[in-house]
Amino acid sequence: MAGELLGEQETHAEITKDELFSEETFSRILEQPDEYIRTKLLNECKERAKELKCYRQFNDMFHAYKRSLNAIDRIGQGTGVSHFPPGKPIIKTGHWIANTNGVFMVKVLPNGEDIEEFASSMPILPTATLVNADTGIAKVELSFYDKHWKSAIFDKSVISSNSSIIRTSDYGTDANSANAGLLVKYLADCLKLNGDTIPQRTSISHMGWHNGEFIPYTDGIIFDGEQDYKPIFDAVCTKGSYEEWKTYVRELRKNIYLRLQMGASFASPLLSRIGALPFVLHLWGGTEAGKSVGLMVAMSIWGNPAFGKMTRTMNMTVNSTMTTAAMLRDIPFAGDELQIIKEQGGNYDRLIMSVCEGVDRGRMKFDKVNEMKTWNCAFLFTGEEPVTRSSSGGGAKNRVIEIECKGKVINNGRETAEFVRNNYGHAGRDYITYINNNAAELEHLYGCFIKTLEGIDCTDKQRLSMAAIMLGDAIGSSLFFPGEQPLSAADVQPFLKTKAEVDIAARAFEYIKDVVAINDNRFSSNSSGDMFGEVWGRIDSVVYGKEPDIKEERKVYFNKTKLVEILREAGYEFDAVKAKWAENGSLSRNTQGKLFHATKCHGIKGSYVLLNM
């Protein structure tokens, strides 16, 4: 059989040296489909080569011929450039073979055999190098092909480490522990060989203001933030008719609740320009009031208002809320169904204080300290209940403009939601252009709105936040809804908290007055002079004046331990309010100037706080 395959020779012993080295012999061996026969023929030829004393030359020639055949099948071998599917530029690859089958190199074994070592089983290449404008961190955009081209941006340190590069598989590459080293080397070679042709760009991890420009309304800057936030970044876009949006929304703005939601949305990019702080606008009330749809209308200023895009449910942690706010930076944060995120203790105080600080806490990884994230945006929330409680701290109360929806925000919710899902994003760019062109006037206008609110009983923080909403509303009205009257002080006054409503000491004292009123038996004996149950103190009443102007002053001696306990159960701290109580006369000091009185109440000696009611 061997003789038949190798020509007319009967045995391998009759093969001459020229015939042994001929292309026909090599071809007939390699074309044999049966591996057993192919190996047998090759071994017979090697034995004949030994007899002719040319074994080494035969072996070299045979493997050279085999490699030459492989080269024909491997498009790109020896050319030093990529032959990837269309859609990406051709790059230099050096000794790497880069084609539709992936990226690999050919390694020759000591026995002369050659094997393919794959860095990637799919086409992959660096398509851009980036430097983050805020941090200076170098990043690389990788493009990879799996039925179609995909791209993702990674820190350069990630693609430079055998262990870290495996993380790129989360985004679709085929990096694994087996090929990691080769893939790192291939990408490093590509970056070195193509340093003068790969585009170098500036990147940023957030939206909003940057060096006087507003992302994403700026060309030439790429978003390099976490991939989880890419849908939000991409949602800042346009769809549908600008004119139809203005006409439709003009009618909706006759509702004061929607007007305030849109005013807060317009105010968000103004905050850093006018020196204002982040604030919360919270609309609450029963279901089917149209609060969520109103939120969508307010976010349609900037882009796609659908849930999961510019609007999101609050099924997220406080930390996630802060990192999302840092990514938005100056674009408003819109969160629906706030009650989902309620703290275990039953309040939202931590959320409010965290988002209104505008700075995320520092965090440290094992190898580096994370960048301190900041934001300066408005937070638009909706829910079924108030965001603050009677026991909420003054800081939380102060930072929230909280509005109970006693009527509907949107009358036809389904129709309106459908409309803004198909018409959105046009107003944002024009609004930012106006801000840039009129930057010098903004602080003056802001000051004017603050002055219009000075006659209203409210705290400074409430006044400053509402003035920002009024400024945003006024600019929005003039740009998109000409002829519309801007919000006035009378329009917004019902939604501002008075100083007393914000003052935690005043709220705590009112609470204790109610406790005393419904627990009179804890302070007073019955008609027989007996006390039953726990004794909390005593009440001394002083009556003065004449008819009809008789007045009664009640002095309540309240057991210190019980007072602290009752306040704490309601969410107040005695130590936080005692100084204010003493200052305004609600609490009387003893003759030594101390807050506590050592006295007897119904025969029981103890330490008491004297409250004037």
Which residues fall in each region the model found?
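Conserved glycine-centered beta->alpha loop in an early N-terminal alpha/beta scaffold
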Residues: 11-13, 33-256, 323-324, 328, ...
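DNA transaction DNA-binding modules
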Residues: 33-37, 42, 67-82, 198-252, ...
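P-loop NTPase catalytic core of nucleic-acid-dependent motor ATPases
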Residues: 220-307
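AAA+/SF3 P-loop NTPase mechanochemical coupling elements
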Residues: 326, 364-381, 396
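A short beta-strand-to-loop transition that corresponds to the Sensor-1 phosphate-sensing loop
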Residues: 337, 376-386, 404-407
